[in-house]
Regions:
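Short, P/G- and charge-enriched loop/turn segments at secondary-structure junctions
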Residues: 44-49, 128-129, 195
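Metal-dependent catalytic neighborhoods of phosphoester/phosphodiester hydrolases
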Residues: 120-130, 276-277
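Active-site glycine- and acidic-residue-rich loops that bind
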Residues: 120-122, 194-206
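Metallo-beta-lactamase
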Residues: 1-102, 106-118, 134-197, 214-221, 245-261
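Cap/insert and terminal regions of metallo-dependent hydrolase folds
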Residues: 84-91, 95, 213-299
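Active-site metal-binding loops of divalent metal-dependent hydrolases
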Residues: 17-18, 72-75, 115, 145-146, ...
């Protein structure tokens, strides 16, 4: 399924790869915390069986006359024996992408908030036994700090077993094709799109700031995996390289989006275009963005 909305004058398509269930207990075993969770989390974000939806999804932005893809998911047939949710997927992602009316060759820029397998996999696709760029006319914009973290050719490289092979299959072919732009922590892709640092989940993790005509939005990658981490930004579920930085980043994003009435669009939330953060009686509330209602296409 592909969904479309308009945010701040920019046309945005969401392209879903896959939705998978995860027990809430994998995020926290604190029973007191769970019992005190606000009602607005149920059932949209936590179901009756205490399961949460984790969505792998990308966005296509039409802004400033350019076509920009954000976080191109995992890819099919990738061997990740140490990370079952990404292992040997077989999804109609490219068909859903095509349903938007945007062709891979129409894409001007690809941006990955970080270089975990589920955020850069469709950078490439397998053709005649080798990985080649999926978006042949695009510039693949990657933050230099994040690129260095995963460059397996470096003598100081520290591997992470679940992410093994991602650099070689999803990043290096783009480098070899001459399509990569390695940029500083803060960088403008277009007049309305700026990369900003959001470290913690990975050391070079970034977010993409859409400065729309009437509203702003932040594509924040894995700064948050679930709204529970907005309510409890100090909750450590063990997925961050530097949790101290991750907690600081979460608090900064929350403050920024509250102050600016900006949408926050996390990579894995079960809402296609993120939502707004509000304060209700002093408590933080995340309201999914449903205005205007998103239109849907099925591949």
């Amino acid at each position: 399924m592909a969904k479309k909305a308009e945010i701040g004058g920019a046309g945005i398509w969401q392209v879903e790869e896959i939705t998978q269930k995860k027990p809430l207990s994998a995020m926290t075993g604190d029973r007191d915390l769970i019992e005190r969770l606000p009602k607005w989390l149920f059932p949209r974000f936590i179901d009756a069986e205490s399961q949460v939806d984790i969505v792998s999804q990308s966005w296509i932005l039409i802004v400033d006359g350019r076509v920009v893809v954000v976080d191109p998911c995992t890819g099919n047939g990738r061997d990740f024996p140490d990370f079952a949710p990404a292992h040997m997927l077989d999804t109609p992602y490219l068909e859903r992408f095509a349903a938007t009316g945007v062709r891979p060759e129409d894409v001007d820029f690809v941006f990955c908030t970080h270089l975990h397998m589920d955020h850069c996999g469709w950078n490439t696709m397998l053709r005649a036994g080798r990985y080649v760029p999926t978006f042949p006319n695009a510039r693949y914009v990657m933050v230099q700090r994040e690129f260095n973290r995963w460059d397996s050719r470096r003598p100081d490289h520290v591997p992470l077993a679940p992410n093994a092979g991602t650099f070689e299959n999803s990043v290096l072919p783009v480098i070899e094709a001459g399509l990569a732009d390695l940029v500083p922590d803060t960088f403008s892709i277009t007049a309305s799109l700026q990369i900003e640092p959001a470290p913690g989940h990975t050391i070079g993790h970034s977010m993409l700031h859409l400065a729309g005509e009437s509203r702003e939005a932040y594509f924040v990658g894995d700064a948050f995996h679930h709204p529970i981490e907005m309510i409890h930004p100090d909750l450590d579920s063990g997925t961050c390289e530097s949790f101290a930085l991750a907690s600081q980043t979460r608090r900064r994003i929350i403050e920024t989006c509250l102050t600016r009435n900006a949408l926050v669009i996390p990579a894995h939330f079960p809402c296609a275009f993120g939502g707004a953060l509000k304060l209700a009686e002093g408590e933080l509330v995340f309201e999914p963005y449903d205005d205007p209602p998103a239109t849907s296409l099925k591949a």
